[in-house]
Amino acid sequence: MNSVVIGSGFGGIAAALRLKAKNHNVILIEKQQDLGGRARVFKKNGFTFDGGPTVITAPYLIYELFELFNKKPENYIKVHPLNIWYRFIFEDGYSFDYSGDENSMKNQIEKINKDDVKGYENLVKFTEKIFDKGFSELSDVPFNKPFFMMKLIPSLIGLKSYKSVYSLVSSFIKNEKLRRILSMHPLLVGGNPFTTTSIYALILFLEKKWGIHYSM
């Protein structure tokens, strides 16, 4: 069977490889000179630039592609877990190191507003519920049937998907700095924390589940 995949971002490459593993003859079409989509690397005036995202939040999805061809990922790529994920620096000079170290996170939160430590814990628990529904159950399900989408409405309402990410975070967190820190995740996918649906808050828990990695 012949198949054509348009776009060589992570999704396009993954689709092409999965089809190839099923013995399809695959043509991968890309308008840029290099593969990778937003994850491509390009050079200009002697400098090397990342075309988009620079970190990996669910490395097992990449490992799966190598396993389809009985290849060992470590023979081709090096993926390093990061200790500090993001460093936030505010206009007043205050900095916050965001990481998967819960003790460090809570200590930093306590220094800003001790009452928000409990709110942070509750926020993480709530984003786990969003993750369970939005990622674990639905990430690989095609949304091509209106009735199926209608059945999701009660669950989405229960998860407060009508709120923005910032609004959801604000319902748990009172300090403005912490609100901005904990609602930044839509920026990673080109969204606005003040308008993007709170379903994207699942990224907060996704990072805690698998960590953040950098590919060398």
Segments from the language model and where they lie:
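N-terminal glycine-rich phosphate/pyrophosphate-binding loop and immediately adjacent elements
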Residues: 1-129
